[in-house]
Amino acid sequence: MALISLRQLLDHAGEFGYGVPAFNVNNLEQIHAIMEAAQETDSPVILQASAGARKYAGEAYLRHMVLAAAETHPDIPIVLHQDHGSSPAICQASIRSGFTSVMMDGSLREDMKTPSDYDYNVEVTRRVCEMAHAIGVSVEGELGCLGSLETGQAGEEDGVGAAGTLSHDMMLTDPAQARDFVARTGVDALAIAIGTSHGAYKFSRKPTGDILAMDRIREIHEQIPDTHLVMHGSSSVPQEWLEIIRQYGGDIKETYGVPVEEILRGIKMGVRKVNIDTDIRLAMTGAIRKSLSDDRSEFDPRKALLAAKKGARSVVKLRFEAFGCAGQASRIKPVPLERVAKLYS
């Protein structure tokens, strides 16, 4: 099956009331794990790559691994999404490389550290939409800065994260402003700020409404009911994998992620794309540590990497099933980007 646009997939998810986990990838084992879980559950896939992932794997290597996934799993619709684009030029380069969806993160300046002003965000995002939509590529924007309502810190992942201490207002998307932003930019999907952050250290305790503003999703959705909402920093940080990492020599302090049941609340309120990276990293790290410890004489890295792939696959399968993705892939008929482009004209 050819790669499809994010807009087509999220429109389908909106019509049938499910959410799609968007998994960050940077290596072969991660892509294998995601595609095998998708095949097993008949789930559509969003594979997304950050600037750090593209630097690590190499743009061409990453692109061809995704094309190989599409060839190997012809019945599974795949979106290739650029995560956290820092400028229109970066988004343009990704489109030329074959990405079918790009995120223009105008909530931060091009250094991906400095919070931007609203007009800057609108202008750079509008320019990317104009460029991408002309050829059927989807665009995700971001309004508000990801960050912890507990600490005021954004956290950092692959070089992305606001520096300094952020105010509560900066870390919560304003619903009325979201309506204006969508009207002025034309984004297909909007990443919103509700107190989530990148990385494993999201919350020091199980999150409640004072540090995870789930009700804000409903308020935003009421203002922009036709725009797909995106939750970033939404790994659940499985405690069982933290225990395995600690048991086999790792040192990860007490931490909590976004509970799956809270994500399901978000899906009911209009969230269609749920970004997940840390959960896969934790599962792979735990599996590798256990594999190497269980057989200290083993020197074939494939054994540990196979264990890592199995660990990641188990997490991915659970998310497909929980979010309602399972069984949806076979219901999607791919629309060529050329036809998608006509929808914007």
UniProtKB/Swiss-Prot annotation:
Dihydroxyacetone phosphate binds at residues 199, 233-235, 275-278. It catalyses: beta-D-fructose 1,6-bisphosphate = D-glyceraldehyde 3-phosphate + dihydroxyacetone phosphate. Pfam families: F_bP_aldolase. Pathway: Carbohydrate biosynthesis; Calvin cycle; Carbohydrate degradation; glycolysis; D-glyceraldehyde 3-phosphate and glycerone phosphate from D-glucose: step 4/4. Binds 2 Zn(2+) ions per subunit. One is catalytic and the other provides a structural contribution. Its cofactor is Zn(2+). The active site is at residue 83. D-glyceraldehyde 3-phosphate binds at residue 50. Its EC number is 4.1.2.13. InterPro entries: Aldolase_TIM, Class_II_FBP_aldolase, FBA_II, Fruct_bisP_Calv. Belongs to the class II fructose-bisphosphate aldolase family. Catalyzes the aldol condensation of dihydroxyacetone phosphate (DHAP or glycerone-phosphate) with glyceraldehyde 3-phosphate (G3P) to form fructose 1,6-bisphosphate (FBP) in gluconeogenesis and the reverse reaction in glycolysis. This is Fructose-bisphosphate aldolase, chromosomal. The lineage of its organism: Bacteria, Pseudomonadati, Pseudomonadota, Betaproteobacteria, Burkholderiales.
